[in-house]
Regions:
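Radical SAM enzyme core and accessory elements
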Residues: 25-29, 339-342, 349-443
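Radical SAM [4Fe-4S] cluster-binding motif and immediate context
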Residues: 132-297, 317
């Protein structure tokens, strides 16, 4: 981390726009990480900042500017340059005074024209990067972050970058981290964890937010052997292809929970999205985790290529058979830069002008297949949650664990949030039905 720099995450820390402007007066260079969904709003922020500080240098990083840097630079004139894909060393080069035309992996304007410098090679030596936990400790209040299925407070970090899986819908490997799987040494990861345990004793859980944490068995078991003596509680991502021995090593080393992308309970859809996994393997994986006492948070997606009303029902039934502790159900989003986006674009399946959220930030379906209306997919997301969590077994599991852990206050807060979102989702479904009925009547 550059001396004098600062990591600012305004929203969770309730830092107002006026306060952000005040903070920026002490800086010469601003790097903004943007997402596909936040891109329009972030452009407006950048324009306001440019109006306030005309001499401030502004750089954007993230998927939307990586996938179409020409459009980004032409849309937002507040931007001085863009870093494509990994940006760690590009921003350091600029901060250290290197001219734009000598920095790899960036795009910028020169004489009114967009210029794309040669790509920067992917970072191979991840151990050379600074420990993010030191930066978080210095600049962030981790109590401001809450993920319902993780212990509170938690800290997230990475032990690898990239993902060799070819899932057609997944944004990060296709736009930012790449498919080449690169790893930190197990010694470096264990040293950081030991350091944080000593310096940050209030943290209750560490989350490895790797694209695919345990894809290599030997490396995972080696890392677990070094984490086990630290007696930490941690969680990670996982694919269903992970075998029992690896899961056991993780459990013995302090792993508590796995975030798992099951995506669908329909075999053909798993093939369509190049998931590299089967329904049968997913069942075996869930059984192994249950046997070992590992908690699973399962991710599911409705509206993937090949989806039908029957396949949606198959996925809901499949999820209930797996009976994992918590789930997240998303509608399929075709992010620019992904194979799914090209598939949906070429076939004319994208609706709503590719708008993925409403004005309040709630997900909306923007892919519509013949015979599967987008409003039906949204309705089934709503029904999926209800059928899953309002089962007596599922509800009691969540409540009993909160009682055992002394987390009733948190359960109350999260239940209120869940019911609020459920109410908003229900309203969206009703409004879509009403609009459809009105359109049918007018026709």
């Amino acid at each position: 981390m550059l001396e004098g720099s600062r990591l600012l995450d305004a929203n969770p820390h309730h830092i107002s726009w006026l306060k952000v402007v005040e903070i920026l007066k002490d800086y010469e260079f601003l790097v903004l990480f943007t997402s596909t969904i936040a891109w329009s709003g972030d452009q407006r922020w950048a324009e306001k900042i440019r109006d306030t500080y005309p001499k401030l240098k502004i750089c954007f990083v993230g998927p939307p500017v990586t996938t179409d840097p020409d459009q980004a630079l032409n849309e937002c004139h507040a931007i001085d340059f863009i870093c494509r894909r990994e940006f760690d060393y590009s921003v350091v080069d600029f901060a250290n005074g290197k001219p734009l035309d000598q920095i790899l992996g960036i795009s910028y304007r020169k004489n009114g024209q967009v210029v794309h410098n040669p790509d920067r090679p992917q970072i191979e030596d991840l151990d050379a990067l600074p420990w993010v936990t030191d930066i978080y400790k210095r600049d962030l209040d981790v109590t401001k972050y809450n993920v319902p299925f993780l212990l509170h407070p938690f800290v997230s970090l990475y032990s690898t970058r990239g993902c060799p899986a070819q899932c057609t819908f997944c944004l990060w490997p296709q736009t930012l981290s790449g498919h080449a799987w690169r790893k930190r040494s197990t010694d470096d990861v264990a040293a950081e964890m030991s350091h944080v345990k000593e310096k940050w004793p209030a943290v209750k859980e560490f989350f490895f937010d790797d694209d695919t944490f345990n894809i290599q068995k030997a490396r995972t078991i080696e890392l677990c052997a070094k984490l086990k003596p630290l007696k930490l509680t941690w969680s990670s991502t996982s694919r269903v292809t992970t075998d029992y021995d690896t899961l056991k090593a993780m459990r013995d080393a302090g792993c508590r929970l796995l975030i798992v992308g099951f995506e669908s309970g329909d075999p053909q859809i798993l093939k369509n999205i190049k998931k590299g996994a089967t329904v049968e393997r997913a069942r075996d994986f869930a059984r192994d985790c249950h046997k070992l006492g590992l908690t699973i948070h399962g991710d599911f997606i409705l509206g993937l290529p090949g989806e039908t009303k029957d396949s949606i029902r198959n996925t809901i039934n499949f999820a209930k058979q797996l009976d994992v502790e918590t789930i997240q159900v998303s509608v399929a989003h075709a992010f620019p830069g992904t194979e799914l986006f090209e598939y949906a674009r070429v076939n004319g399946f994208i609706t709503n002008g590719n708008k993925m959220t409403d004005d309040l930030g709630h997900q909306i379906a923007h892919i519509e297949y013949p015979g599967l209306p987008a409003d039906y997919v949204m309705e089934m997301v709503h029904r999926f949650y209800d059928e899953y969590f309002f089962r007596p077994k599922a509800a009691w599991r969540v409540v009993s664990k909160a009682i055992a852990n002394g987390d009733l206050k948190r359960l109350y807060q999260e239940s209120r949030s869940f019911l609020k979102v459920r109410s908003q989702r229900s309203k969206m479904v009703r409004e879509a039905r009403t609009q459809k009925t009105a359109e049918a009547a007018s026709a």
